[in-house]
């Protein structure tokens, strides 16, 4: 089975050099994951897309990888042919493939064309649609509400007939935007924040401040591993656990309860900054959202941030709890 990988739109508006770098990064990421899973790493990259070919018996495995890899906007499952680049030759090949699919149904043809041809995309649509309407057992053409939508892409003499269009994860290729260290607790907010940083192309390491014993640490490690395994395993990352029970005990004896939340988070950022320096990481990620709890007012967040010279990213900062 062959796939055409459409890139995230924000990649497509970059300059040629940046676009090339990101496309190459995405191809390398896919090759690593495919190889790790025992799939042939048949990935070709172009400036505006990727093409992937996998054995038919590994389609489900391949699609699971493609749909969970940052940087991919759409995955097109296609049948691909070399054709004479004429209207008649294209129409005849399309008829061979789609005639059974449109029998007894209304249809529409949508085409994209790239390369040197003596016709444009609209002319290609009209010609193929007319040929199918005359020769297939369809009930007719319906431009607005068809039962079957036939999608074609013609690039020079390569014809791709789209079987399915699948929604990808979006974002930037992992590793293309640097690395961050995410403060994780095992809760929903920090998990979502970590996912969003990965989807944005940030290689995401994990740091956990243990306040509740071994069982809690194991649970957080499992959540972090799940995130990495599903969305980020093209890159190796670190999971760092820091025992913080003693710190909490000291705080309980030295400060009032009203300052506890802010002070604890300041100390966590100070410790995380040291780890980030060792990893060569430029920013920290947290799952905080403005005003969700008392320690997350703007004033308190500013006090917390003052404890570190690192940039602190908060992907959930303006999101409501139901959105998260």
Residue ranges and their predicted role:
Residues 1-181, 191-237, 306:
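RNA-binding accessory domains that recognize and position tRNA/RNA substrates
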Residues 48, 241-244, 289:
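A glycine-rich phosphate-binding loop feature that marks nucleotide/adenosyl-phosphate handling sites
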Residues 81-86, 149, 246-249, 320-323:
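A short acidic, often aromatic-flanked loop/helix-cap motif at beta-alpha or helix-coil junctions
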Residues 130-132, 165, 171-177, 248, ...:
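Active-site adenylate/phosphate-handling loop in enzymes that bind or generate adenylated species
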Residues 182, 206-208, 241, 286, ...:
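Structural beta-sheet core signal
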Residues 185, 209-211, 244:
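Cofactor-binding loop segments of dinucleotide-utilizing enzymes, especially the Rossmann-like FAD-
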Residues 220, 224, 272, 324:
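Aromatic/hydrophobic pocket-lining residues that form π-stacking "cages" and hydrophobic walls in ligand
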Residues 229-256:
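S-adenosyl-L-methionine
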């Amino acid at each position: 089975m062959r796939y055409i990988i459409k890139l995230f739109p924000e990649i497509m508006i970059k300059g040629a050099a940046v676009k090339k770098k990101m496309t190459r990064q995405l191809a390398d990421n896919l090759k690593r994951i495919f190889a790790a899973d025992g799939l042939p790493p048949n990935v070709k990259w172009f400036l505006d897309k990727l093409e992937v070919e996998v054995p038919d018996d590994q389609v489900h495995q391949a699609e699971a990888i493609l749909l969970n890899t940052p940087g991919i906007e759409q995955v097109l499952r296609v049948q691909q042919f070399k054709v004479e680049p004429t209207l008649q030759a294209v129409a005849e090949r399309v008829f061979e493939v789609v005639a059974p699919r449109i029998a007894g149904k209304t249809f529409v043809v949508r085409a994209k064309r790239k390369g040197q041809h003596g016709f444009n995309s609209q002319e290609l649509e009209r010609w193929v649609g007319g040929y199918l309407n005359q020769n297939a057992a369809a009930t007719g053409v319906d431009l607005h509400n068809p039962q079957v939508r036939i999608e074609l892409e013609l690039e020079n003499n390569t014809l791709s007939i789209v079987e399915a269009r699948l929604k990808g994860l979006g974002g930037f290729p992992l590793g293309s935007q640097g690395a961050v260290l995410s403060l994780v607790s095992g809760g929903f907010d920090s998990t979502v924040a970590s996912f969003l940083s990965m989807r944005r192309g940030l290689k995401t390491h994990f740091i956990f401040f243990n306040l509740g014993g071994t069982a809690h640490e194991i649970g957080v490690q499992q959540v972090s591993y799940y995130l990495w395994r599903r969305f980020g395993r093209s890159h190796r990352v670190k999971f760092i656990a820091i025992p913080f029970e003693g710190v909490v005990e000291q705080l309980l004896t030295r400060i009032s309860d009203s300052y506890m939340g802010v002070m604890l988070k300041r100390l966590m950022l100070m410790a995380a900054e040291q780890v980030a320096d060792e990893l060569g990481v430029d920013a920290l990620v947290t799952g905080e959202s403005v005003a969700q709890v008392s320690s997350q007012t703007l004033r308190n967040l500013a006090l917390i941030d003052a404890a570190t010279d690192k940039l602190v990213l908060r992907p959930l900062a303006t999101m409501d709890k139901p959105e998260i």
